[in-house]
Structure formats: structure tokens, C-alpha cells
A protein has these predicted regions:
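ATP-binding N-lobe of GHMP and related small-molecule kinases
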Residues: 1-86, 100, 104, 108-110, ...
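Glycine-rich beta-alpha junction loops
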Residues: 26, 36, 136, 164-169, ...
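FAD-binding core of FAD-dependent oxidoreductases
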Residues: 8-12, 16-23, 88-95, 123-138
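Alpha/beta catalytic cores of group-transfer enzymes, especially the acyltransferase/condensing modules
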Residues: 110-157, 244
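Short beta-strand-to-turn element immediately C-terminal to the catalytic PLP-Schiff-base lysine
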Residues: 33, 132, 138-143, 254-258, ...
Length: 298
């Protein structure tokens, strides 16, 4: 039996649509062992598929097939801390758990690059799967087969406050609202800000983040699908956030604050409640630089 720890992820980071993502200190756990049948259970009562449609099982089976092996069955126990359909990489966590677990069971025939590529092929884009696997902040380009990526570990005195509503937003719906084409001007707008985000985060020029998270490719459209989104942004900025953006496809809003900004999450939550937005919860995290880990093996 092996036990796997997989971090939540926050993708896009404002202007870095489908290219930038980072891992957070917020984890799912999966226990996995080979079996002669499919046995899947939830350790914490969160409803998960218990048949061969389970995404962890599907991903593990894909890896076995890539390696020329047949997966007869799998025994899985899932602890799902990461909320589903909230823009925090819950599906990517399942994919990466399945791949890393299966690769470990087979004696690690695939390299890290192989796993990054296979995860992106399953998910369709690497902005959540790559940081879930690698940790840190990851810049990635997916050409349909191969992911070209750079991971950078981040040791900054920042906290990331995930402001999570009590409703879901499916990625399919969040993508369907996006335009088929954008102007050259808007493309340049995003390119410059995506580059500014990474450079500012890594060099400590945090005052740039408010500009760097601005975006014209996805956030203006997705805000219309997230009730009270603009008000949540305003509240976070009023309490001193460096930058605020929609995490992944949403509906979670991520606020970046300085470590010295004491009780930031609590102050944001207090203001949300006073504004009649008590359905939004606030959780503070740091950047996870380790990525997915095998934390027990016997």
C-alpha cells in the first residue's frame, strides 16, 4: 500500500491563462494498492465515483497501458480536502494521484517529464496538473503531446487566501463563456502582465501584482458567472491584498497578501459576512514547493 499527498493548485494567476499555475499547502490524500477488482471508498464522506469511471482509477489505468501493463484492479481510499468544481484543481489532483501512484506501483518506469506530459494529455492543459505534480510556480506550454515547462520554487513571505463560495462552477461552463477570438491589443495586454506576474513574484516586487493580475482573456467573462465576484475583489483589496484573481475557472477568488498582514483572512471573512456574503469561506495557504509526494509505502 502506498499513500500519496497531492496539493491543490491555483491556475491562470490572472493574465497567465492556461500557462501559469502554482501549488498550495492544501492537500488531498490517496491510499492505493493493486487488487484483483476495483474497490474505491471515501474516507471523509465526500461522494466519489466508486467504479471504473473514477478519475484516479482511469489515470492509473492509462499509465499501466502506456507501460504495456494490464491493471486488473485497484483498491483506493480517498480523502478529499480540496473542494470539487471550485477552481482549485480537484480533477488535476485526481489525475496526478493516479499517475504517481501507478508509476510507483510499477517501480517508476516513467520519468517526471513523462508524467507531466501524460497528465496534460488527460486533462487537456497543464496549468493545474504540472504544479500539482511538481510544486512551486510552473510556467508551461502544451503542444498537444509534449509539455515544455519551468518550475520555480518560491520562498516569499506571502499568503494566498482562497475565498471559496458555497456553489460550484463547472470548468466546461466557464470555458464555454469565453470568446473564440480576441484582439491583438488584448493579447498584448495579457502577455505583458503574465510576464510581469512571474518576475514580480520571484523578485519580491509585490507592488506590481495588482497590475499583473489584470486580464482581458477570461476573467471579465467569468465574473458574470460568479455572483458578487466584483464585491469580493473589492473587499480583499480594501484589506490590503497585493493582487486578487479568479482561481482557475472559478468560482474561488484568490487574494495574495503579505505575511505581515495579520488576520487578513479573518478580516476578509468579517467583511464578507457584513456584506451579506456569509456563504463565502476564507482559507489561508502558502505555496507548496514539493508537489505530489509518496508519504507512506509498505
Amino acid at each position: 500500500m502506498i499513500k500519496i499527498r497531492i496539493p491543490a493548485t491555483s491556475a491562470n494567476l490572472g493574465a497567465g491563462f492556461d500557462a501559469l499555475g502554482l501549488a498550495l499547502t492544501y492537500y488531498n490524500y490517496v491510499e492505493m494498492e493493486e487488487s484483483d477488482k476495483v474497490e474505491i471508498r471515501s474516507a471523509d464522506g465526500v461522494e466519489v465515483p466508486t467504479d471504473e469511471n473514477n478519475l484516479i482509477y482511469v489515470s492509473a489505468k492509462d499509465l499501466f497501458e502506456v507501460c504495456g501493463k494490464k491493471l486488473e484492479g485497484l483498491k483506493l481510499t480517498q480523502t478529499n480536502t480540496i473542494p470539487m468544481a471550485r477552481g482549485l484543481g480537484s480533477s488535476s489532483a485526481c489525475i496526478v494521484a493516479g499517475l504517481v501512484g501507478a508509476n510507483t506501483l510499477l517501480g517508476e518506469p516513467l520519468t517526471t517529464d513523462d508524467l507531466v506530459d501524460l497528465a496534460a494529455q488527460i486533462e487537456g492543459h497543464p496549468d493545474n496538473t504540472a504544479p500539482a505534480l511538481l510544486g512551486g510556480i510552473v510556467t508551461a506550454v502544451f503542444d498537444g503531446r509534449k509539455v515544455h515547462w519551468v518550475k520555480q520554487e518560491v520562498f516569499t513571505k506571502l499568503k494566498f487566501a482562497a475565498i471559496i463560495p458555497d456553489f460550484e462552477l463547472k470548468t466546461e461552463k466557464a470555458r464555454a463563456c469565453l470568446p473564440k477570438e480576441v484582439s491583438h491589443k488584448d493579447a498584448v495586454y495579457n502577455l505583458s502582465r503574465a510576464a510581469l506576474f512571474s518576475a514580480s513574484l520571484l523578485t519580491g516586487k509585490f507592488e506590481n501584482l495588482r497590475t499583473a493580475v489584470h486580464d482581458k482573456l477570461h476573467q471579465p467573462y467569468r465574473m458574470e458567472l460568479i455572483p458578487n465576484c466584483r464585491e469580493v475583489f473589492d473587499i480583499a483589496y480594501n484589506h490590503g491584498a497585493y493582487g486578487v484573481y479568479i482561481s482557475g475557472a472559478g468560482p474561488t477568488v484568490m487574494a495574495i497578501a503579505d505575511e505581515s498582514n495579520e488576520f487578513f483572512g479573518g478580516k476578509v471573512k468579517f467583511s464578507l459576512d457584513n456584506a451579506g456574503l456569509s456563504g463565502w469561506q476564507v482559507h489561508e495557504f502558502r505555496i507548496d514547493n514539493e508537489g505530489t509526494k509518496i508519504i507512506d509505502k509498505n
